Swiss-Prot record:
Family affiliation: Belongs to the HGH1 family.
PANTHER family assigned: PROTEIN HGH1 HOMOLOG
InterPro entries per the UniProt record, alphabetical: ARM-like (IPR011989), ARM-type_fold (IPR016024), Hgh1 (IPR039717), Protein_HGH1_C (IPR007206), Protein_HGH1_N (IPR007205)
Protein name: Protein HGH1 homolog
Alphabetically ordered keywords of this record: Phosphoprotein
Encoding gene per record: Hgh1
Coiled-coil residue windows: none
Biological source species: Mus musculus (Mouse)
Pfam family, one: DUF384
Length: 393
């Protein structure tokens, strides 16, 4: 005899298939109301419905299988009023936030990056922030990021697109209707690409120098975090460390200042610090975002990869700032990153031939041991978080 569980299972599967078929039909039926030229009130209602669908994973999966609908949505997002561009743009933001939909979006409209870039760089476009957020979401993973970069370079040859993007990022009043904070994460994601880092680190362009003040940008942690992420990625290029730490850029004070608090130092210690880090006000606040603090520490850590870099970081009193940060830091993972950097600064120099930590070849057995130690650290960190009452993840 067939048990009730089996019978209800078949019924449930049939019901689920019927629901999926109905949802597909619903998506197809929406298409005529989304195309350009459709009646305005119906078009607005259809765009709102699609926006609601993108709020759930099942809705995003459904829409990902409808390339014509995705293409119509992009057309609406870049269309002038009275088209419902805002709702269409926000639907694209939600879709692009789902990594499982990235390739479907790019396949539905291969010109999507170029079209959105034009919106982002238009000082009059009211939904430029949403367009920037779509591009930032699409560029989070390496493969879509590379595809996106290829399209951007084709749309704006000779790196003009990157130059204009940086200009918009560094000009808070670029668009009166849109703050463009998401250009920060977009540039950070794009800086995963060697070609972008080469542009940012070109001594003749002075791009990095324009980004440095934004490490203190108080109006948006999104913009600030994106810039810090960009600088951290640039610090992977150890051949540029001498230039970055030298007088032309002088990156270290910009990385350390957000990590500094109101603590007082002795006169002898104060003399070790760069001028910008001396005699800070009693109400000096550290960077409030833990993720950004960690990226700042990681950037300084990368600058210590070479022996000359370690010497410069030591000579500029980084240890003093990190010592006080470690005493204050409430987040265990950030404190751990701080500890590792302090160990590099106060530890002995590596033996001959291993001075560049980014070029050291680690044997497989040692790498496995390091991975096991890292896993052990993560487990201890998780236990500490639970002990402090943090929720389980």
């Amino acid at each position: 005899m067939r048990g009730p569980g089996v019978g209800s299972g078949f019924s449930g599967e049939r019901g689920l298939l019927e629901q999926e078929a109905g949802a597909d039909t619903e998506a197809v039926e929406l298409l005529p109301f989304l195309v350009l030229g459709a009646r305005a009130d119906l078009q607005a209602a259809a765009a709102q419905h699609v926006l609601a669908l993108t709020g759930a994973g099942s809705g995003r999966t459904l829409l990902a299988g409808q390339p014509e609908l995705l293409r119509a949505l992009v057309d609406l997002a870049v269309a002038p009023a009275p088209a419902p561009s805002r709702d269409a743009s926000r639907a694209l933001v939600n879709l692009a936030a789902d990594p499982n939909v990235h390739w479907q979006l790019l396949a539905a409209d291969p010109e999507l990056p170029a079209r959105l870039l034009r919106c982002v760089l238009d000082p009059q476009w009211p939904w430029a922030e949403e367009a920037a957020a779509v591009l930032a979401n699409l560029s989070r993973e390496p493969a879509p990021c590379a595809a996106l970069m290829e399209k951007l370079m084709a749309a704006e040859p000779e790196r003009l697109g990157l130059e204009r993007l940086v200009n918009a990022l560094c000009t808070p009043s670029y668009n009166a209707a849109a703050p463009l904070h998401y250009l920060g994460p977009l540039l950070s994601n794009l800086s995963q690409q060697a070609e972008v880092r080469a542009f940012l680190l070109d001594p003749d362009r002075c791009v990095v120098q324009r980004l440095l003040p934004l490490t203190q940008y108080t109006d948006s942690s999104v913009r600030r975090g994106g810039v810090v992420g960009t600088l951290r990625n640039c610090c992977f290029e150890h051949r540029h460390h001498k230039w970055l730490l030298g007088a032309q850029v002088d990156i270290l004070p910009f990385l350390l200042l957000p990590l500094a608090g109101p603590e007082e130092f002795s006169e002898e210690e104060m003399d070790q610090l760069p001028v910008d880090l001396q005699y800070l006000s009693p109400d000096k606040q550290r960077e409030p975002d833990a993720d950004i603090r960690k990226m700042l520490i990681e950037a300084v850590m990368l600058l210590t990869a070479t022996a000359p870099g370690r010497k410069q970081v030591r000579d500029q009193g980084a240890y003093l700032i990190l010592r006080e940060l470690h005493s204050w830091e409430p987040e265990p993972d950030v404190r751990m990153a701080c500890e590792k950097l302090i160990q590099v600064l106060i530890g002995d120099e590596p033996e001959a031939g291993m001075e560049n930590l980014l070029e050291v070849q680690v044997p497989e057995d040692v790498e496995q041991q390091l991975q096991e130690l890292d896993q052990q650290e993560q487990q201890e960190l998780a236990q500490e978080l639970r002990g402090n009452g943090a929720p389980h993840t």
